[in-house]
């Protein structure tokens, strides 16, 4: 066992003394059992994580029952909804790297034999996922689960995205204060990750097809007894993985990454999943995984399930309709869409895991014969603004919009754009360009949920587009193109767009272009000032120095002269 490094031999007597002092060693025989880390992310200010201490206790009990010795530690977490619209959002994506580094540090410093990861919200799941393939210790994931959808006084289903869009409607005068306050009070009625197919739930669903979590992980409610049963079940599976020495890199292969994007396309997941899954591929040592490959997957996978913010359906509706397993089963039966014979943490293949799954409500999950669209709900765009690619959630765009051509109105920050939208400087026919908000430029690639929600809240969801080297919340909908690469701070051509330039977003052809000759763009480049970091000290300064653009997954890159 790995843990023998800290508990066997005369030299480890001091370590054994310290282990006895933890209170986790209940009998002499415990030193001969596998040591299992519980990587938790309990935090009081994140509603998706307030109940995770209780779930960790369930995991501890089950791990002991299955023959292991549990040791819990905690990571940090950022709530994107609370951190939205101010400097806190600049810490959100960077927190992914802190979480990965922290988990790596504890796991490798203490030579654990297995790891039970309990994430839930936006950057916590991918951060832990990066740690799992980096340390490559037998591991399993079981998230905290989604919250229930809210309900307004008028009987309308609510999610957090309802509140963000209500801000724009209230400012516009099209919503009463009474209705506005009703939404605020009732949109998030329980603990758990936000109720729509936003980033947290998208990632937790992808864990099922990656093979790192048991069926039900993505949709079983946080407040249900079934969530506790998933934790127990996962603990026993983890002990089998430890016994058989099945490791994350045995499960997370190039085929698994392909299948994650296939499910993402079928359920119209958050665009942030593209960032995180590309980063995962890099961390797992999977080479040459790029945005063009994702487009190829999108072309062969139908769009089967529209969930909030693209519809009124919540994650609980998906669960009742058959869950992620029902969507995966449709892809298995489609043939050629995924690789169903890959091994998973259950010891079974994907095909075996979903063999008995079925669709219980064809309004929530469409059968493969009747998809929302024959192609996936996410699309990668390329063109002279985004030579390395950009991302759009086509499932969140009104179907009547196939090509959008408009006049650029440019901003160098999120805040400038929000002010212009709110004071009606932005009008019908505009393409709002927000640059210098990428991983390096932001820094931290903040989400542009406030401007997109204001656009939709003003009733301009089909009439105004927004493009950015920043990113979007999973709650974003509308004509919103993000992750433009290279970013402006890295000299990307989005920095060369001027007010009044005509920009064309062509969804069928997956292109994003500005109608300006190449030679004019090159002349503009000569006048472009050198980018200077916005933050000079602390973690964000270090992050700025090392981070890369979105087409890599926004990973940190060590200078080559330090590793050659």
Curated annotation (Swiss-Prot):
It is an enzyme of class 4 (lyase). GO terms for biological process: isoleucine biosynthetic process; L-valine biosynthetic process. Its cofactor is [2Fe-2S] cluster; Mg(2+). Its EC number is 4.2.1.9. PROSITE patterns: ILVD_EDD_1 (PS00886), ILVD_EDD_2 (PS00887). Functions in the biosynthesis of branched-chain amino acids. Catalyzes the dehydration of (2R,3R)-2,3-dihydroxy-3-methylpentanoate (2,3-dihydroxy-3-methylvalerate) into 2-oxo-3-methylpentanoate (2-oxo-3-methylvalerate) and of (2R)-2,3-dihydroxy-3-methylbutanoate (2,3-dihydroxyisovalerate) into 2-oxo-3-methylbutanoate (2-oxoisovalerate), the penultimate precursor to L-isoleucine and L-valine, respectively. Belongs to the IlvD/Edd family. This is Dihydroxy-acid dehydratase. It comes from Listeria innocua serovar 6a (strain ATCC BAA-680 / CLIP 11262). The lineage of its organism: Bacteria, Bacillati, Bacillota, Bacilli, Bacillales.
